[in-house]
Amino acid sequence: MTTVSMRDMLQAGVHFGHQTRYWNPKMKPFIFGARNGVHIINLEHTVPMFNEALAFISNVASKKGKVLFVGTKRAASEAIKEAAISCDQYYVDNRWLGGMLTNWKTVRQSIKRLKDLESQSVDGTFDKLTKKEALMRTRELEKLEKSLGGIKNMGGLPDVIFVIGADHEHIAIKEANNLGIPVVAVVDTNSSPDGINYIVPGNDDAMRAIRLYAESVAAAAKAGRGQDLAVQAEQDGFVEAE
């Protein structure tokens, strides 16, 4: 089972919150104190809460569930994308488009358009167009890929969303809440934990902390998927008796 230790979190700077004047009082239960005007997050809470979240994600993946990684802040986008790809899951790393979950029917049409354009770009269709038309379609393809590339193969709504930066991604969290999709989110001292099923109190700006969260969630999803594949293989009779 994937777990993260107190040492891992300390080394990554998970315990450093925001300046005290920007705090959200709802995060008080998770704050240890303050140092030099900066809130210090109590990792005695964060460690078990994050490990509980990882166990949940692993369980979702073990049932062929879809995990959607969400992190559109500059500090988070690259780590989110890499982690999602590494565990064969899905991501939104550029900008959360309103209705991405709650208006899935429309999003699905845009994904179909994206896939049509991808096909046209490789089957020679673009070559038969005028230079201007080909350029317009190329730009449309690039724009759609940037917005929807991480979810184009999701094939439906996710079973859980993992969010870096609760404040920044409040629209995604609200949409998930409306649809009853569980939310796992990293919540800094300046953010609200409302609407989050699995709260991970921690720094949501430091690159090392973000990579620790993202890579741990990816490892948990992979471990869960491995359990699923092992069960499937056993059912298919591929596992030899020792």
From Swiss-Prot:
GO terms for biological process: translation. Pfam families: Ribosomal_S2. The gene is rpsB. InterPro entries: Ribosomal_uS2, Ribosomal_uS2_bac/mit/plastid, Ribosomal_uS2_CS, Ribosomal_uS2_flav_dom_sf. This is Small ribosomal subunit protein uS2. Belongs to the universal ribosomal protein uS2 family. HAMAP family: Ribosomal_uS2_B. One of its GO terms (cellular component) is cytosolic small ribosomal subunit. GO terms for molecular function: structural constituent of ribosome. Keywords: Ribonucleoprotein, Ribosomal protein. The lineage of its organism: Bacteria, Pseudomonadati, Pseudomonadota, Gammaproteobacteria, Alteromonadales.
